[in-house]
Amino acid sequence: MKKKVLAIALVTVFTGMGVAQAADVTAQAVATWSATAKKDTTSKLVVTPLGSLAFQYAEGIKGFNSQKGLFDVAIEGDSTATAFKLTSRLITNTLTQLDTSGSTLNVGVDYNGAAVEKTGDTVMIDTANGVLGGNLSPLANGYNASNRTTAQDGFTFSIISGTTNGTTAVTDYSTLPEGIWSGDVSVQFDATWTS
């Protein structure tokens, strides 16, 4: 009888030890990329974003990170042109939360320290006034060539404002509801060849 009690006691001890051990904890996240493919080598002006934007909330700063969004610009030269101008203008910049809250975030766009706004054009190149475009300067040098010219540059994107429900503005991003916001940031580019 003592042997049976001892055996049962040992089984109970070993079973109890399993419960006391730490359990594994696993977490999973999914990253999703939007994907399309397009080729255009004949239009007079082609602007191609070189990547996507992903803003992450950082608890330590109670805000979202900023992003450098690169783009490629290709133009067809015009041998009769005497001047060239390239401008940009913000078209859309609102991200909406993917739930029923209606929360929104507005994305600000900066080009070399100048805000790209919906209300006016931001001059990127203006050869007639000596604005040669920084990283886009190959365009300023090749606008009157007989072939295509390309250059790359980037905008700085950042979250500049938000709402909790589509109307109530927040000054402290930590008060935003949890979740994911989605939408498009669109910038219009206009090129003018002057003859």
Curated annotation (Swiss-Prot):
Keyword tags: Fimbrium, Signal
One GO CC term on file: pilus
Cellular compartment(s): Fimbrium
Segment forming the signal sequence: 1-22
Signal found in the keyword field: yes
Note: Not expressed under classical laboratory conditions, but is functional when constitutively expressed.
Record gene name: ecpA
Pfam families from the UniProt entry: MatB
Main location per the UniProt record: other
Function: Part of the ecpRABCDE operon, which encodes the E.coli common pilus (ECP). ECP is found in both commensal and pathogenic strains and plays a dual role in early-stage biofilm development and host cell recognition. Major subunit of the fimbria.
Top-level taxon: Bacteria
Coiled coil (residue ranges): none
Induction of its expression: Negatively regulated by H-NS. Positively regulated by IHF and EcpR.
The protein's name in its UniProt record: Common pilus major fimbrillin subunit EcpA
Family per similarity comment: Belongs to the EcpA/MatB fimbrillin family.
Assembly behavior: Self-associates. Forms filaments. Interacts with EcpD.
